[in-house]
């Protein structure tokens, strides 16, 4: 009887509690109707405004709050947006936030001021309505985003290297897509400098680009014609890009075609010294080489896809990309003056003059990639599922004519490779306590086969096949604790199984399996205008498949190159700090890398031939990076200035036969300083003038020494016409000073290399773009297997 009474009492208490509990859930969007992530949403009791509970919106802009207090006030805040307060009783389930407009001397400059806010361990920069939204291509624009910089022709997150890039949640697989995407189409950019457990353990930085969602239906298109003229070498690179889309109700179909022509010239001077003992004497082999490699090609990239919103919280879509290389060839010329002499007496033993001309052709029979996704929500449970497929094949042939001391010979080589990948990624999200729990899995299967055949060369043929399976599971929890801050903790487990088959010599085949855990932690807090974040993570870096290839590449009679299938993975520990106050940003990161991947040079045989080989370093590499960014707006002038340094710390003991002990200690601790100055002046009648200056000092990085300062100066003028600047003409001249050549030294003890590379960036580019009824893609695929795709593409 007591049990029955107790059960009844507990049931009544539970019923009363449920009756008093109120659940408030909704969705937050911006002025363009796009979901807003990471908005702080809190409930305050009335009339004293005491904190009751709080949460942050997820990637879909949704939140859920539970409270027993019916008389509450709902408050929503986000940096750069107006605060919203309303009684819970008046909340209709959705709310739209509006950006703050700032006034300077009674002139409204909304639409000019770039806004960057610190959200956890990421920097979110508004592009739409700012000068950054009128910066030409997405590639040009990203170089001006706080936390990023341009290094030669590559984009980097400062201190993190090249990032993995997503466009509307879809993993970008073709780097040239940034040249085709216009800054006018972009809403905001998120730079994540310490990605959490949801990303592959090889990913050290992420850039997420979100395009604008414009209202309306029907047909829209944009087209661009451009020409890039190389002022130093004379080549011309025209290009045509078109994008089309049709939207009706909740269904959208889209596609695009891009025809490109590209030329590249690599012009460098190379000096090499190697030392070895021979018959009790110190033999020195000295090489002085002039190299020039001309790459000429054109191709056609195309894509087609659809996005279908089945219901309010359910979307599916698919995108297929094809990349055709229609005609590509290379012309490589090398002249080498080789001397061998005894170091002590300078007695000349051998003197050869070698010239080498290679004519190469590259064909790509096929290169396809696709992504399909489902994104939805069932009750409070969020679901994000992606499947990716990628397949490619390429063939390269080289005909070589070599003349040594007047004696000519001919050689040839052929390289055929194919790669296939399939991957999936599933992520569940669920609100829990004051935050959100994310759990998921990611799997990929990669197969790559390569065959390298030579005729007339002093090396052997090779044929290999690599298969790799990657299975990952992860969990991450993020929450906000009032007056303490926002916390995120994640753990990722990755199992990698790799099978290397040497098809010509099975005894050299090998199997390797690794199982690793990768934790990540972050904390963020705001005090008034000061925002802070601190993060820690463990990452890895796996060698790309070219590094694993045992194929020996013939360079000249005195040099060879080869990979190593026995390479280990790197292990990275990273600690990051960000501080933001108004328009000032301080970024700092420290990392330690074990088993660092690099290239090393060895004495290959008794004749002094050099073998350049991929290796793991046997000492840790440490790096400290610090920078300060300022992005104010003074009237129509919007500068974006960054100054900082990167300081390595690596110490080695090198084998050096010139030393009595046979070894020599060496250290790399000299910092590299850098300055990036982006300046934009917005003038009446849709005129815009841009100036970019970059300076980098001498210094050291890993096991390389940069021996000279470099400077780059670019200018751009842009003029737009018609409604919403639909027609834009843009002219740019790059590397005006022509002071961006790089002089690099590599010291391996018994071998030293010095290379002076001449810049290929002195160009003039002219582009004209027209957009009609532009409605941006709603594609929401997030992609899977991003690390495997990048390793397949790395050369």
Regions found by a protein language model. Give the residues of each.
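Short acidic/polar hinge/loop motifs at secondary-structure boundaries
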Residues: 66, 144, 170-196
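N-terminal periplasmic accessory domains that precede
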Residues: 91-98, 106, 138-141, 175-176, ...
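Face-selective signature of the C-terminal outer-membrane beta-barrel domain
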Residues: 299-327, 354, 358-502, 524-531, ...
């Amino acid at each position: 009887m007591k049990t029955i009474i107790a059960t009844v009492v507990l049931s009544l208490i539970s019923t009363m509690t449920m009756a008093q509990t109120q659940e408030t859930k909704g969705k937050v969007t911006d002025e363009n109707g796009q979901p807003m992530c990471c908005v702080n949403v809190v409930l305050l009791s009335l009339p004293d405004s005491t904190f009751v509970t709080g949460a942050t919106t997820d990637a879909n802009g949704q939140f859920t709050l539970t409270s027993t207090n019916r008389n509450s006030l709902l408050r929503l805040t986000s940096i750069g947006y107006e605060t919203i307060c309303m009684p819970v009783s008046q909340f209709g389930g959705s709310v739209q936030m509006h950006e703050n407009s700032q006034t300077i001397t009674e002139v409204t400059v909304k639409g000019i001021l770039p806004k960057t806010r610190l959200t956890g361990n990421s920097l979110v920069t508004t592009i739409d309505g700012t000068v950054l939204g009128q910066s030409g291509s997405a590639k040009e624009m990203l170089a001006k985003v706080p936390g990023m910089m341009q290094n030669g022709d590559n984009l980097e997150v400062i201190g993190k290297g090249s990032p993995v890039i997503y466009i509307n949640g879809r993993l970008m697989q073709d780097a040239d897509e940034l040249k085709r995407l216009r800054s006018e189409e972009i809403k905001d950019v998120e730079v994540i400098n310490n990605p959490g457990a949801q990303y592959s353990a090889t990913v050290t930085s992420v850039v997420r680009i979100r395009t604008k969602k414009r209202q309306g239906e029907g047909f829209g298109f944009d087209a661009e014609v451009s020409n890039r003229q190389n002022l130093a070498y004379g080549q011309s690179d025209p290009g045509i890009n078109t994008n089309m889309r049709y939207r009706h109700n909740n269904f959208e179909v889209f596609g695009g075609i891009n025809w490109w022509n590209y030329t590249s010239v690599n012009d460098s001077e190379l000096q090499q010294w190697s030392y070895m003992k021979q018959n009790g004497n110190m033999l020195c082999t000295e090489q002085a080489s002039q190299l020039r490699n001309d790459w000429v090609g054109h191709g056609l990239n195309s894509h087609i896809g659809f996005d279908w919103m089945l219901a309010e919280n359910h979307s599916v879509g698919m995108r297929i990309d094809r990349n055709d290389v229609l005609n590509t060839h290379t012309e490589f010329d090398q002249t080498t003056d080789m001397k061998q002499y005894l170091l002590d007496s300078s007695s000349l033993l051998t003197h050869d003059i070698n010239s080498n001309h290679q004519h190469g052709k590259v064909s790509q029979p096929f290169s396809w990639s696709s992504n399909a996704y489902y994104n939805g929500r069932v009750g409070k449970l969020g679901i994000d599922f992606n499947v990716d497929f990628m397949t490619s094949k390429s063939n390269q042939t080289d005909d070589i004519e070599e003349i040594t001391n007047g004696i000519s010979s001919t050689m040839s080589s052929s390289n055929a490779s194919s790669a296939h990948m399939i991957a999936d990624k599933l992520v569940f999200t669920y609100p829990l306590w004051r935050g959100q729990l994310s759990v998921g899995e990611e799997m990929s299967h990669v197969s790559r086969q390569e065959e390298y055949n030579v005729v007339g060369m002093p090396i052997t043929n090779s044929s290999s096949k690599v298969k790799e399976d990657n299975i990952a599971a992860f969990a991450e929890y993020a929450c906000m604790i009032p007056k303490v801050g926002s916390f995120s903790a994640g753990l990722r487990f990755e199992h990698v199984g790799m099978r290397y088959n040497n098809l010509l010599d099975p005894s050299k085949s090998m199997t390797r399996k690794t199982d690793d855990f990768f934790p990540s932690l972050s904390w963020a807090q705001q005090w008034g205008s000061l925002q802070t974040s601190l993060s820690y993570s463990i990452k890895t870096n796996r060698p790309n498949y070219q590094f694993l290839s045992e194929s020996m590449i013939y360079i000249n009679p005195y040099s060879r190159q080869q990979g190593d299938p026995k390479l280990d993975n790197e292990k990275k520990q990273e600690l990051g700090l960000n501080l933001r106050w108004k328009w000032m940003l301080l970024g700092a990161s420290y990392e330690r890398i074990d088993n660092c991947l690099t290239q090393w040079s060895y004495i290959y045989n008794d004749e002094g031939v050099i073998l350049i080989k991929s290796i793991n370093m046997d000492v840790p590499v440490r790096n400290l990076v610090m920078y300060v960014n300022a992005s104010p707006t003074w009237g129509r002038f919007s500068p974006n200035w960054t100054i900082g340094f990167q300081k390595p710390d690596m110490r080695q003991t090198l084998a050096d036969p010139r030393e009595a002990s046979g070894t020599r200690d060496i250290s790399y601790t000299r910092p590299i300083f850098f300055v990036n100055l982006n300046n934009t002046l917005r003038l009446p009648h849709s005129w815009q003038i841009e100036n970019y200056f970059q300076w980098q000092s001498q210094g050291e990085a890993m096991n390389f020494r940069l021996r000279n300062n470099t400077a780059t100066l670019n200018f751009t003028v842009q003029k737009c016409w018609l409604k919403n600047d639909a027609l834009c003409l843009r002219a740019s001249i790059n590397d005006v000073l022509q002071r961006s050549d790089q002089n690099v030294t590599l010291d391996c003890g018994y071998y030293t290399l010095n290379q002076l590379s001449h810049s290929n960036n002195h160009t003039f580019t002219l582009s004209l773009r027209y957009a009609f009824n532009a409605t941006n893609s709603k594609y929401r695929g997030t992609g899977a297997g991003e690390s495997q795709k990048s390793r397949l593409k790395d050369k």
